[in-house]
Amino acid sequence: MESLLLARLPEAYVVFSPIVDVLPIIPVFFLLLAFVWQAAIGFR
């Protein structure tokens, strides 16, 4: 039962692989956005 579920999960997530590839970049993007925003306000 578990082996069937584990075998079927990767095939189900093939559709979401581009989204999963982008997900680790999103926190870095928000961190850079917050840093630029604080720098712009600080240098005003």
From Swiss-Prot:
* Any single Pfam family the record assigns to this protein: PsbK
Highest taxon of source: Eukaryota
According to its UniProt record, where is this protein mainly located?
plastid
Location in the cell: Plastid, Chloroplast thylakoid membrane
Keywords associated with the record: Chloroplast, Membrane, Photosynthesis, Photosystem II, Plastid, Reaction center, Thylakoid, Transmembrane, Transmembrane helix
The record's comment on protein family reads: Belongs to the PsbK family.
What is the stated purpose of this protein? One of the components of the core complex of photosystem II (PSII). PSII is a light-driven water:plastoquinone oxidoreductase that uses light energy to abstract electrons from H(2)O, generating O(2) and a proton gradient subsequently used for ATP formation. It consists of a core antenna complex that captures photons, and an electron transfer chain that converts photonic excitation into a charge separation.
Protein name per the record: Photosystem II reaction center protein K
| Upper lineage | Eukaryota, Sar, Stramenopiles, Ochrophyta, Bacillariophyta
Q: Which gene encodes it?
A: psbK
